[in-house]
Amino acid sequence: CRTYNIDGSEIKVINDIFDNLIEEMGMISQFEIPPLPKLAFDSDDVVAYDTVVCNKMADVIEKENRKMRDTTFIIAVFDSLFTCYYLDLNIANIEKQLPERSYIDALNAMKDSSIISYQLNLSQIKSNKRVTLRYYSEFPKGFKIWERENYNFLFSGTLKMSRIYFDKEKRVGLIYCSYACGRLCGEEVIICIRKISDKWSIEKTILLGVS
């Protein structure tokens, strides 16, 4: 059974940082078209280009991006906040990148076998971004999840989050997150969070891997 009781503090943390987490990991912005490259000038600082064509291209890009900004994306979230105990994390490397020593307690907690996974209730997670969360288990298994042509919605990707590991005073914490936007596209990070005036915010993102 994957259902374990928690005191609700971890859900509060997720709600406090979730919109920023979406931005940090590019779960929406990856779908926007990058702007036109800067024009390259010759040695005489003269360049020849068709302003009409360039302006039309810029207008098309902006129009498509506005459309994306009004679109709701679906994110497949793994059903459980999992324990980091069984992950092969390079703890020494993570420690070197921590914002400050106050995170050491939280880092040590990631090796605590008594902190176990628990099933996530997505209805408790709120977001002001244009996303809808669905359980990963509701999607096709394996690589079939990436067959976007079979969906009648815009599929952003998959998100996996760990339990939240706090220091003893619950002033700072660490979360392992991985986001995949395709078969060979994604990243895994450690999110460093800090509590300021009863609200949690992301202080630093430590990149563990990218593909």
Language-model-detected regions and their locations in the chain:
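Exposed beta-sheet edge and beta->alpha loop/turn motif
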Residues: 170-196
